[in-house]
Regions:
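Type-3 copper protein
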Residues: 1-122, 183, 203, 215-507, ...
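Long, low-complexity, charged/polar intrinsically disordered regions in eukaryotic proteins
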Residues: 120-175
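Extracellular/oxidizing-compartment recognition motifs
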Residues: 165-178, 223, 236, 240
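Short, positively charged loop/turn segments that connect secondary-structure elements
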Residues: 173, 206-218
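Positively charged, polyanion-binding regions of nucleic-acid-associated proteins
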Residues: 183-193
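Short acidic, hydrophobic short linear motifs in intrinsically disordered regions
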Residues: 194-205
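C-terminal structured domains
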Residues: 451-675, 746
Length: 749
């Protein structure tokens, strides 16, 4: 079956720190030796660096005790032990990544000795945000940095409005900043047409406005910094692989206790980075202590891990099956195009501005003079597929899995009414790779992850150090760039990489995207390739689009980050949603008619399991919360639905492999059902495979057809707001409908 997607020549593997044998041999047993596990130096350091509070609890308890505190600590410890042996999604030292290439045959071998693994160590976003805020609050530290005018500022009616504040000021602050745009602010904005340090700016202000009191000017400048009307070029550090290294280079001529403390922290972090896992406990604790003396934070150190592989090749045949599975999932996805909130905004835009003019972005999104931001929540996507229902009922009646054949695939393709140009231009498919003959006729198989895909290729790899697999990383980055360049040339569209300082400090960890060949819009940071004032919004009959006057082309924003844009600023979200346009996304398999049932059989295409067998457990299935009665009821439910012992418990993006014959595992399940109200149990494949490690695969895919649509003719007319004058007289006439035409002809025309 031919797919509309090509797979990349490269892929990402993600694997846990420990082999599957740890889970199978020790963690499925009723008697787990927690003390021995915690005495293992590698495991101890992994817990220490991942969850410091749990590390403290485990250090201060007797594992033989049966108090509630000890039981809770052991249960949390068990979850982490299971995760570090069964789940590959990157998380500190628990699991890591590596880059691989396609070949004729699959050959993935992960190095067993973790001493060969590589740690990338830097300051955590929680602490880094406090550091930058401190530096921007003390003139001595920012006087030689450049003054940056905040691109978000909207100026109108002699006032400046700013509708967003970053985590550097206050997390989740939703207050609108509004200040008078006086002559001094106008002078500052005009002066910043050229690079200007704060020290030079104060001198210019003093000369221009004849202010002799330098402290008065400094206080005014600090007030602007506190409101983020302006900010410092020190924020460039947030874009760097090693922010602390960048800042220390800037302060190389400083000699005081604070800078010496930063230098010592940096030295200890670089020392810790090259230490073998399991030998860095004392150094890590020393770094935490040094950092906490400067600023208290939720977390202090961010660690990413590169796993070492002996061989890392995925067969081209498997890659081809991934591209076919991606196409099949796209065909089975709901036919909703784009984001529902964007649809509502589009309709309102058409009513107010029409098709024959473009509107300045900042004016459009202003609550004062424009439409403001869409406040509606994204509507849940519904799917009602007769194909899936027929397959479901047939599988249930015959007690079989749901198999989608090539003939089914062809029928779905023939009945498809959505143009392939509405498929994602690029994406990434998440799956787990297994060796074994679980599926007849195949020696290898894939299981598509519950979170199926990303919004664009490159998003998953973005936050990881450029030092990880540098050569292959560069080739992958170039491949992605070439795909978008081809699209740009076909559609007169410029692709821009967008980034911002998030609302929540810890999101700085995943929002970092390293260097890129694309032009950039860095909100709340220096050195953007494009300005917000240059952006305009227009509309066709079916969607909104973004336009740049300078480049005279439409603009498409992408990101190399897995940060959910819903958690970002309203402006960032708007730019991303408009860029996604009328895309039909690759979604997990869901159907309104099937989702209401407690059981769904496995859904498979060839050797790709599109959805594992799934059982849904609700809190109202259990009449008693008393442990023994609850477990008895659970085993009756397990027997009735024929739920296997080896399953994966899933709620949201959280997944945990558990064994239902183990009391400790059932206790975890009970707590989650009572806490969440509902959990899913997914068929687990660890026991059905020959893997010595759980291997997650992230495969970039590209749509073959790059032409997206007929070229849009950009209107030459730019919307200009009518400036009302106070001396105008406004009269509203209310006339009976039957007399309106006569009145207009006789008195108005």
């Amino acid at each position: 079956m031919k797919s509309i997607f090509n797979t990349s020549s490269y892929y990402i593997i993600r694997a846990p720190l420990l082999p599957v044998s740890i889970y199978n041999t020790y963690l499925k047993n009723d008697e787990i030796d927690y003390s021995s596990f915690f005495q293992n130096k590698i495991i101890e350091e992994t817990i220490l660096t991942t969850t410091y509070h749990l590390y403290q609890s485990l250090t201060n308890i007797s594992f033989d005790s049966e108090t509630k505190k000890v039981r809770n600590a052991k249960e949390s410890f068990l979850k982490y032990l299971i995760r570090m042996s069964t789940r590959g999604t990157p998380y500190g030292l628990l699991s890591g990544i590596s880059l691989g290439q396609l070949a004729e045959k699959t050959n993935i071998q992960i190095q067993e000795d973790v001493n060969y693994y590589y740690k990338s160590v830097k300051v955590d976003g929680s602490w880094l945000s406090k550091l930058i805020h401190f530096l921007e609050s003390n003139y001595d530290y920012y006087q030689d940095s450049y003054v940056i005018w905040n691109e978000r500022n909207y100026i109108t009616d002699q006032r400046i409005y700013l509708d967003n504040q970053t985590c550097l000021i206050q997390e989740n602050n939703k207050e609108l900043v509004s200040i008078k745009n006086n002559d001094l602010l106008k002078f500052i904005k005009q002066s910043l047409q050229e690079d200007l340090t704060f020290k030079d700016l104060i001198k210019l202000i003093s000369e221009k406005f004849l202010i002799n009191d330098e402290q008065e000017i400094k206080s005014f400048i600090q007030n602007l910094l506190d409101k983020e009307i302006i900010f410092t070029s020190l924020r460039t550090a947030l874009k760097k692989e090693n922010p602390l290294d960048y800042l220390l280079c800037f302060y190389r001529d400083f000699d005081n206790d604070f800078i010496r403390s930063l230098q010592l922290i940096h030295f200890e972090m670089m020392k810790y980075q090259i230490m073998e896992i399991g030998k860095g406990k004392k150094t890590f604790l020393r770094i935490r202590e040094l950092m906490s003396h400067l600023f208290k934070a939720k977390e202090y150190i961010q660690i990413d891990t590169k796993i070492q592989t002996k061989n890392n090749y995925l067969s081209k045949k498997i890659a081809g099956n991934i591209s076919e599975a991606a196409y099949l999932l796209w065909l089975l996805s709901p036919d909703d195009l784009g984001i529902s909130t964007n649809h509502d905004f589009h309709y309102s835009f058409l009513e107010k501005y029409g098709l024959e003019q473009i509107v300045n972005l900042k004016e459009l999104l202003s609550d004062i003079n424009g439409m403001g931001y869409c406040t509606n929540e994204d509507k849940p996507i519904k799917n009602n597929s007769s194909f899936l229902k027929e397959k479901y009922y047939y599988a249930l009646s015959h007690k079989e899995e749901i198999e989608i054949t090539e003939n089914d695939f062809l029928d779905l393709e023939k009945k498809n009414t959505i143009p392939i140009e509405r498929a994602p231009l690029s994406s990434e498919i998440y799956s787990e790779f297994y060796y074994g003959n679980c599926i007849n006729g195949y020696d290898e198989f894939l299981v598509i992850s519950p979170i199926v895909s990303s919004f664009n290729a490159g998003a998953t790899m973005g936050r990881f150090s450029q030092e990880i697999d540098r050569d292959i990383r560069k080739q992958l980055d170039n491949e992605i760039y070439e795909q978008y360049i081809e699209y740009s040339n076909e559609n007169n569209t410029e692709v821009i990489h967008i980034n911002e300082i998030p609302k929540y400090a810890r999101n700085l960890n995943i929002n970092h995207s390293g260097t890129t060949k694309f032009k950039e819009l860095d909100l709340d940071m220096p050195c953007s390739s494009i300005t917000l004032d240059d952006l305009y919004v227009g509309s066709t009959f079916d969607k909104l689009y973004l336009f740049s006057k300078t480049s005279n082309s439409r603009i498409l924003f992408i990101t190399h980050s897995m940060l959910n844009y819903v958690l970002c600023s309203n402006l960032y979200r708007f730019l991303r949603e408009v860029s996604l346009g009328n895309t039909k996304f690759i979604q997990p398999i869901k159907d309104d008619g099937i989702e209401g049932f407690n059981y769904c059989p496995r859904i498979r295409y060839k050797n790709v399991i599109l959805k594992p067998a799934t059982w849904i457990l609700n809190k109202d299935m259990f009449s008693s919360s008393e442990k023994e009665n609850w477990i008895e009821q659970f085993h009756k439910i397990q027997q009735f639905y024929n739920i296997p012992n080896d399953v994966t418990m899933a709620f949201g993006d959280n997944r945990l492999t558990i064994n239902l014959s183990n009391d400790a595992h059932i206790s975890i399940l009970k707590k989650e059902i009572e806490k969440q109200g509902r959990v899913c149990l997914l068929e687990d494949f660890i026991s059905k495979s020959n893997n010595d490690r759980v291997i997650e695969i992230v495969t970039p895919i590209y749509r073959k057809a790059k032409s997206n649509e007929k070229r849009i003719t950009i209107p030459k007319n730019i919307y200009k707001r009518l400036e009302t004058k106070r001396e105008w007289l406004s009269i509203h006439l209310y006339i009976d409908e039957s007399y309106q035409n006569e009145f207009l002809i006789q008195y108005i025309l």
